[in-house]
């Protein structure tokens, strides 16, 4: 019944647009013929958008979204019907979302069930992490792949170390290279990677490359054509030709994945571009974190890429050599688990796992993120943890790359500070790491920010680490970052100027749309 009503309102919306357009044409070109005098064209246009905004509001109301999102959209549509109309067409449509991702979700579920291992790892995990039992069981129920204890992980700090490792890995490739990125730049670093991929393709290595069509919209056609001409399969993720008529613009692939010969992998916060090496004048030093994997868990990263590849191309890569990662010998590596999140998931997978991590904390919760727009669940969990005496620290950049998100993020500071959360702003450059560390023996590193876009709209991928050496490196890096940061104190922050508070509150009101 509810879907039928949505469809009726959607048809009425199209009908209103058609009738109003016809009225506009009649008044603009045939007013003398039909005998209409002193008719305001702008008035008719205003009626058009007002009626359309009203119908859109009805659709949003019936979708039963989160109350804050529903209220925000209704306010925007009510006060600014013209702006709200176009904003909804660009960013708000939820009508086709379920149908859009139904096929992908089914394929993902089938593939995960086919390749998910059956190793009985539960006893080993709970022996050393009994208080995190909720997290393990939740990850399993949400469809995360098995934890691997035969995978080497290494934390890569910043662009120089990360891209040196990636470039060397690409040069070692013998069978295949799979890459998936949100942003690819046609600059010095991008050219260096392109040249290696072309050379590897000439050597007979299979190269597949997914790039997000919106994140990489500045990428030149010549860059893509040169790779394709050399035999590299470079495919855009969700290309958008008519943004206003296509709600795919709102669902972006924010993942950063590299898989080499099915046995080495990289995942983390760094895109491909010189700015991520600290060569942008505005940002200066770029602080970011990536993760290197070798061994069993790379199969999970491979599977995530292959599902995205199939969704975009229809090519099912099923050859066994793509999913036979070699386990690294030894029992001292700790555990690693790859988790994919996205609008195609039934559950908000990464958000739920973040929540479980926070809830499992006994001593400390350390978070580094460039964007902080939490929903009520995450916000409450952090405040409750801090009020309970847990050491909760939030590290963010001191300069904005997106002013709307920057100021919306700061609007949450007062209540966090009042609860006892320690907040720091990184001053050496721009902080882009996406890190959560709990009790120094559990961590998440990946592409997901601590914001609603990563939780609800973007395709993301995170690695969850359990008692690995790479966590100890993350802890030390976090401590080093605090040395380059300034702490925000509540008594001082509460005294900020009125106009700054107004800006922050305004952007927070719009945060469900950001």
Swiss-Prot record:
CDD domains: PLDc_CLS_1, PLDc_CLS_2. It is a multi-pass membrane protein. The keyword Transferase applies. The active site is at residues 254, 256, 261, 432, 434, 439. This is Cardiolipin synthase 2. Residues 249-276, 427-454 form the PLD phosphodiesterase domain. Belongs to the phospholipase D family. Cardiolipin synthase subfamily. It comes from the Bacteria. It catalyses: 2 a 1,2-diacyl-sn-glycero-3-phospho-(1'-sn-glycerol) = a cardiolipin + glycerol. NCBIfam families: bac_cardiolipin (TIGR04265). The keyword Cell membrane applies.
């Amino acid at each position: 019944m509810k879907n039928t009503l949505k469809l009726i309102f959607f048809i009425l919306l199209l009908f209103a647009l058609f009738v109003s357009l016809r009225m506009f044409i009649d008044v603009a070109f045939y007013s003398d013929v039909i005998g209409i005098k002193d008719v305001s064209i702008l008035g008719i246009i205003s009626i058009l958008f007002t009626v359309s905004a009203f119908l859109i509001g009805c659709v949003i109301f019936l979708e039963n979204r989160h109350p804050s999102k529903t209220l925000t959209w209704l306010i925007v549509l009510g006060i600014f019907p013209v702006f709200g109309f176009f904003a909804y067409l660009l960013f708000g449509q939820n009508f086709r979302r379920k149908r859009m991702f139904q096929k992908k979700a089914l394929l993902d579920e089938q593939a995960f069930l086919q390749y998910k291992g059956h190793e009985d790892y539960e006893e080993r995990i709970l022996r050393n992490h009994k208080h995190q039992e909720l997290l393990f069981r939740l990850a399993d129920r949400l469809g995360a792949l098995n934890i691997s204890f035969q995978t080497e992980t290494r934390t890569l700090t910043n662009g120089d170390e990360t891209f040196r490792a990636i470039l060397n890995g690409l040069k070692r490739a013998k069978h295949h290279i799979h890459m998936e990125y949100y942003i690819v730049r046609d600059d010095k670093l991008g050219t260096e990677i392109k040249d290696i991929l072309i050379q590897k393709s000439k050597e007979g290595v299979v190269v597949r490359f997914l790039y997000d069509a919106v994140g990489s919209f500045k990428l030149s056609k010549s860059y893509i054509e040169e790779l394709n001409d050399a035999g590299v399969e470079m495919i855009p993720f969700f290309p958008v030709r008519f943004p206003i008529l296509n709600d795919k613009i709102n669902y972006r692939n924010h993942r950063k994945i590299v898989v080499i010969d099915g046995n080495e992998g990289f995942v983390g916060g760094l895109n491909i571009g010189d700015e991520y090496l600290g060569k942008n004048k505005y940002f200066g030093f770029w602080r970011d974190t990536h993760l290197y994997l070798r061994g069993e868990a790379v199969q999970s990263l491979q599977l995530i890429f292959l599902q995205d590849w199939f969704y975009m191309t229809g090519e099912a890569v099923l050859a066994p050599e793509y999913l036979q990662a070699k386990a690294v010998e030894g029992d001292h590596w700790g555990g690693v688990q790859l988790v994919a999140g996205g609008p195609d998931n039934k559950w908000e997978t990464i958000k739920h796992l973040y929540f479980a991590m926070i809830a499992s904390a006994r001593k400390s919760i350390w978070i580094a993120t460039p964007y902080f727009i939490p929903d009520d669940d995450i916000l409450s969990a952090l405040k409750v943890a801090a009020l309970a005496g847990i050491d909760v620290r939030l590290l963010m950049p001191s300069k904005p790359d997106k002013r709307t998100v920057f100021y919306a993020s700061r609007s949450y500071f007062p209540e966090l500070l009042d609860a006892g959360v320690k907040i720091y702003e990184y001053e050496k450059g721009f902080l882009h790491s996406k890190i959560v560390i709990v009790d120094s023996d559990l961590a998440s590193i990946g592409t997901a920010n601590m914001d609603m876009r990563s939780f609800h709209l973007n395709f993301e991928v995170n690695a969850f680490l359990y008692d690995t050496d790479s966590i100890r490196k993350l802890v030390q890096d976090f401590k080093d970052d605090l040395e380059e940061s300034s702490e925000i104190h509540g008594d001082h922050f509460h005294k900020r100027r009125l106009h700054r508070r107004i800006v922050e509150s305004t952007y927070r009101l719009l945060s469900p749309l950001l």
